[in-house]
Structure formats: C-alpha cells, structure tokens
Amino acid sequence: MCEEGETYCPEVKDAKQGKSLGKICMKCKESSAALLIRAGDAFCKSCFKEYFVHKFRATLGKNRVIYPGEKVLLAYSGGPSSSAMVRQVQEGLSRDAPKKLRFVPGILFIDEGTACGMSWEERQQILSEICSVLQQTKIPFHIVSLEQVFSLPGSVLQRGAPEQRPNYKEEVDRFLVQEREQGDAGCSEMLERLEVTDSDSPGSSDKMYQSTCSHPPDMHTQKLKQLFASAKTLTAKQQLLHTLRSHLILHIARTCGYSKVMTGESCTRLSIRLLSNVSLGRGAFLPLDTGFCDSRYGDVDIIRPMREYSSKEIAYYNRFFNVSPIFIPALDTKASENSSIQHLTEVFVNRLQADFPSTVSTLYRTSEKLNVSKIDADQETCAKDRCLLCLSPLDTQAGKASAFSATQLSHHLSQKIPMKSNDLANNSDKSCCQGGQGCKEAGYGDTCQSRALQTPSFVHMLCYSCRLTVKDMQSLDVLPQYVLHEAEHRCHRTEMRKEIQEFLLDEDDGDS
C-alpha cells in the first residue's frame, strides 16, 4: 500500500523527465526540438518562426479586413503581445518578406502613468525606453498621455459612418497593377508617404501628434487623479481606464486618418476577458470585445491579429528572437487576488491552464462561435441607442419579466425609491430633498446634487455594465467634459424629438 509523500522509485521520475528530451521537430523532422508548445508539438527554432509568422499572415489574410494601402494604427503598450505584433508588422513590410504586408502602419503609445500613481520622473524614464524601442522600428509613432482625454471633443462619442469598400479581390488586383506601374514601390516609400501625410495633417502641430510626449498640464493631471480617486473599487478603475484609453485611441485614429487599429490581445488575454466581461455584465457585447474585428465605432475598426496566439507562444517568440518588452506598472500590479473581478479572473484562468492545458483554447473556441446580432439600420446610426461610454448597442431594452428589470426593481426597493413604469429617466430633474425630506430620509445618502440630479440623467444612456461602473463612482462631476457635453446633447435631442413626435411619420406610413 503506497503512502503519501514517499518516493520508492526515484528512477521512474528520471525516466519521465527524459521523455521530453531529444525530441525531433515535428515539422522538418530533422532538427532537434528547441521548444514544446503543447504535448506533441515540438518545434526547432527556424520552424517555430515560420509557424509564428504564417499564423499572423493567415489571420489577416482569411478575414480580409485590411485593404492594400490602408493606414493602420498599431496600439503599442510595451507588453509582450504588442511588442511581438509590432515586430511582425516590421518584418512583414521588409523587401525580403515572401508575402509582404501592403498596408501603411503607424504606432501609438499612451502614457497611463498618472492613473497608476507614477511620478513624472518615473514616467520620463519609461518614455525614454519606449522612444528608443520605437525609433528602431523605422515606423512613424505617436506618444500621448492619458491626460489628453480632457481636451477631446464630444464628437469622439458619436458613431462615424462606415465606409463603403469595393470588393477585396478587385482592390488587391488594382493595387498590384499600380505597384507594377510604379516600379514595385517598397516599404521605405510607403513609410515616407506616411510621414508626409502625418506632417501635413491638421493635428500635426498639436502636442498630441508629436513623436515625443511633453509634460501634460498640471490641471489635467489633477483632474485625472480626482477621476480615478472617485472610483471606489479597482474593478471600476480598470473599466474606466479601458474606456478612456479606447476614446483616446479612437480620436487619434480619426484625426490622423487611420481607418484600422491593431491591438495586441492574445488568446489567453481574450479568454480571461470572456469570463470577466460576463461577470461585469458585458455578456451581450462579447463578440465585439473578443472577436477579430470590432466595428462598433463605424468609421474605425479595431483588429486583433494576435488573438490566435497563446501567451506561452508569444513568450517563446520574444525569447528566441530578441523581442524586448518593457515592463510598465499597471493598476493591478502587486494587487491581491481578490482586488478586482478582472484580476481574480486572470488568476483563476491561469491556474486552470497550469493544471488543464486546454482551458484557454476551449474558452477561445467558445468566443469564436459568438456573433453579433443583426441590428436595424436605423438603430445602427441612432446615437440614443448606443451606450454613452463604450458605444456598444444598449442592452437595457428588456421586458418587465427580464432579469434586468428585476435587478432595477430590487435596487429601487433597497434604496426606498418609488418605482415608476418609466424608470429613472423621468427623475433626472427631481431632487431627493423635496417635501421637507433630507437626503438620508429619501435614501440617497449624504449628498443629493451629484447623485440625485446627475446619475439618473446618465443612467438611461448607459449599458448595464457601464451603469455598474458609474454606480461605483462617488461623483460624476470629475468626468471629462466631452462626456458631460455629449450626455447633455443627447438629452436635448431626445426632448426635441418628443416635442415634434406628433408631426413625424411612422416607418410603416413612410413605406406606403
């Protein structure tokens, strides 16, 4: 009878360890294996590079989203995945590439040091490393600070009109003909055209589009600190940071003429996001948040070309081919496991993956089967049907017997708020201190101006997940002005539509 903790046969342990040694590459069948991705998938160094490059090109090729000559913005964070993505694009533009990439790239790095509690000296040290790395790529780049969100226009929260593109194959053939007529213009000429285009763009004189990031205004830095200090939980802070980052990337892409944005989310990262977003109430938007192409913004598409790579594959590639990521502290750096929903999900998935290697791939295959439901064309272009913060289609148009309505009813009862059929939207101009009642007596807490007047007016413009984020904020006065202005603009449009509603024709009447 075997007992726990005893080792009767140490040679058996050595035999098991020796099984993975001396394997032959599964592809070329000649060279010795240098790495083992999965059980039975042993690669030599050269075959692994060929496998890695082919997967990147195949991901872009089979989706046919990026057209030849199109300007693509690479969202670079300094992490392993985005660093590998930049290297893939850099090598794909070279003359020696067998299947050369034919789009015009640019790189964007956003400095989030203020949100993470870093000093300006620490941020400068990181920015100098970022500049040295990006200068070696020979690709035009932009470095901006997160404080720039306080100077964004309200139009960034408006969905742009999607561009009507011709047939992909016809566009490729036309580009190849032009390339032959011009004498096979190489990558260097494409990059030169990009530099000229960026220098002639309207925003090139702005600090936002310079290759180096200057010190942001102290007023914006203080506002950003107050904004993140108002979020009571780390979960809300991470969601808020993701939202502001998306707005800034979208604005820069539109201003500089980029129609596509590449992000570096890996298969592992998207698997974690799949579970965490369900926990955060974003289950309706999983195809947008985890799919290859996110077209919620209309005129700018978010592309995820690294979504088929696991974090293990990316780590091997960076290690073998001298891709040096830059460590930048994040909001959840050195945080406990239970500090946020996102961090807890990450720890949970990584532990499962260590014991069950098919965990990430199973989650990834599940996300691939999710599709966006077809939305009516009028809803697609109507601003009031989209979330004010994440620009996703609103998921709050549910019936009285839905789980969402039950949650709203429970919230009203717990706060001792009289429930009405028209929900919170009609309470936007009311105060909790009416009829001689105080804030505490009405169930709103100690403050009424920031919560009772502003929160209800925001609620009906947000999706369920963004409502939870706003609910965890102590005050809405610290939000950037472009968010407040767009909310006011939507309210005015809604009131105007109500005033002229009786003069409008129904869709059925218009068709007849």
UniProtKB/Swiss-Prot annotation:
Pfam families: CTU2. GO terms for molecular function: nucleotidyltransferase activity; sulfurtransferase activity; tRNA binding. It is found in: Cytoplasm. Keywords: Cytoplasm, tRNA processing. It comes from the Eukaryota. Gene3D superfamilies: HUPs. GO terms for cellular component: cytosol. Pathway: tRNA modification; 5-methoxycarbonylmethyl-2-thiouridine-tRNA biosynthesis. One of its GO terms (biological process) is tRNA thio-modification. Its main location: cytoplasm. Plays a central role in 2-thiolation of mcm(5)S(2)U at tRNA wobble positions of tRNA(Lys), tRNA(Glu) and tRNA(Gln). May act by forming a heterodimer with ctu1/atpbd3 that ligates sulfur from thiocarboxylated urm1 onto the uridine of tRNAs at wobble position. PANTHER family: CYTOPLASMIC TRNA 2-THIOLATION PROTEIN 2. Belongs to the CTU2/NCS2 family. This is Cytoplasmic tRNA 2-thiolation protein 2-A. It comes from Xenopus laevis (African clawed frog).
